[in-house]
């Protein structure tokens, strides 16, 4: 198949108020061209609606009827993200007729990993049929459910796109890709058949929630608060005994599996420092269980903008860092690009998850396609 223009959409679990939207020209196996990307802000009322949906999802916990707010939030975010797609396409001098498919991840409100004798569950808000009608184009969506039903983790799904990025940058196995969003996830590829991906632990979510809880703003901007604090090493040592951190992959996390309560009783500076140290130390433990420990990490996601977190990564995970921009990638666009890439794979019937990335029995396709 010849490469086609696809649009990818992603909104992270930290609910930073932005819709990540990116254009990518691809055949679902290689990257022909990076197109434009943008961070399009949600109206405040939609962000508030999504925060309420996320809170009600935790109470619901996959038991009984879904909260009524889901339908309201689903329609609102679908319309907002459809508008973001159209804006980006038109700003790029293209029309929707030029777009082969849109990859619509939706908003994760709850994710539950499988356990022995029990399949996992996942819920992303997003109405792919409505988006297809609004944009008059094909839409791939609901990327995780098939994987979960087959016994997989349903996450992370970025591995096959990360491998395509590494193919042109470093296919030696010496470089892994670390994404620091609400949760951290890592992809390692040996350049051949070994492709491994899993969630490393929390990333920005507990720190952001800690800041909000203390009335200090939305996030620890530039890691300024953590930089003033002292890590509670005794508490950190206890936190690092969590069984998830040494469990074998594949494995995945919900955004609330590790919370800001890990810093209860600490002052503002020391709490921020200890949570940041936990995120980075968890990455170090993740590197230790890979088939081969990479020498460097290409870091994407919002966490890469936190100098304190980056310094602690070098120090506590004992690894070299390289900005994804130095490899010719766009750190803010990688996740949205990923869902453009996966959408083309859905269109072609190619696998999007694998035994070594989500734990499914065999490489499998996924996602719903409409339009």
Swiss-Prot record:
Residues that hold ATP according to the record: 12-20
Keyword Glycoprotein belongs to the record: no
Reaction(s) the record says it catalyses: 1,6-anhydro-N-acetyl-beta-muramate + ATP + H2O = N-acetyl-D-muramate 6-phosphate + ADP + H(+)
Keyword presence, Membrane: no
Enzyme Commission designation: 2.7.1.170
General function of this protein: Catalyzes the specific phosphorylation of 1,6-anhydro-N-acetylmuramic acid (anhMurNAc) with the simultaneous cleavage of the 1,6-anhydro ring, generating MurNAc-6-P. Is required for the utilization of anhMurNAc either imported from the medium or derived from its own cell wall murein, and thus plays a role in cell wall recycling.
Stated name of the protein: Anhydro-N-acetylmuramic acid kinase
Origin species: Brucella anthropi (strain ATCC 49188 / DSM 6882 / CCUG 24695 / JCM 21032 / LMG 3331 / NBRC 15819 / NCTC 12168 / Alc 37)
Taxonomic lineage of the native organism: Bacteria, Pseudomonadati, Pseudomonadota, Alphaproteobacteria, Hyphomicrobiales
Gene: anmK
């Amino acid at each position: 198949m010849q490469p086609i223009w696809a649009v990818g959409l992603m909104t992270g679990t930290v609910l930073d108020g932005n819709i990540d939207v990116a254009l990518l020209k691809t055949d679902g196996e290689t990257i022909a061209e990076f197109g434009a990307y943008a961070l399009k802000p949600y109206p405040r009322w939609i962000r508030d609606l999504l925060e309420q949906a996320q809170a009600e999802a935790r109470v619901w916990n996959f038991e009984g009827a879904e909260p009524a707010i889901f339908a309201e939030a689903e329609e609102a975010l679908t319309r907002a993200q459809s508008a973001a797609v159209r804006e980006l396409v038109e700003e790029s001098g293209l029309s929707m007729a030029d777009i082969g498919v849109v990859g619509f991840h939706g908003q994760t409100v709850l994710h539950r990993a499988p356990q022995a004798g029990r399949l996992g569950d996942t819920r992303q808000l997003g109405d792919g049929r409505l988006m297809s009608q609004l944009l008059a184009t094909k839409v791939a969506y609901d990327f995780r459910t098939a994987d979960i039903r087959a016994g997989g983790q349903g996450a992370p799904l970025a591995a096959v796109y990360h491998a395509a990025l590494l193919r042109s940058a470093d296919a030696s196995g010496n470089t892994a890709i670390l994404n620091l969003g609400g949760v951290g996830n890592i992809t390692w590829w040996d350049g051949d058949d070994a492709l491994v991906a899993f969630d490393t632990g929390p990333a920005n979510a507990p720190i952001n929630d800690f800041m909000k809880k203390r009335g200090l703003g939305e996030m620890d901007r530039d890691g300024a608060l953590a930089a003033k604090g002292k890590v509670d090493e005794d508490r950190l040592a206890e936190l690092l005994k969590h069984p998830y951190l040494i469990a074998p992959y594949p494995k995945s996390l919900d955004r609330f599996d590790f919370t800001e309560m890990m810093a209860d009783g600490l002052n503002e500076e020391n709490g921020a420092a200890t949570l940041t140290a936990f995120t980075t130390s968890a990455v170090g433990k993740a590197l230790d269980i890979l088939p081969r420990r990479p020498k460097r990490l290409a870091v994407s996601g919002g966490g890469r903008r936190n100098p304190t977190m980056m310094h602690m990564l070098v120090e506590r995970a004992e690894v070299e860092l390289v900005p994804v921009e130095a490899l010719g990638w766009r750190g803010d666009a990688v996740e949205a690009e990923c869902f453009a890439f996966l959408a083309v794979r859905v269109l072609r019937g190619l696998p999007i998850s694998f035994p070594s990335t989500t734990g499914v029995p065999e490489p499998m396709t996924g996602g719903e396609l409409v339009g």
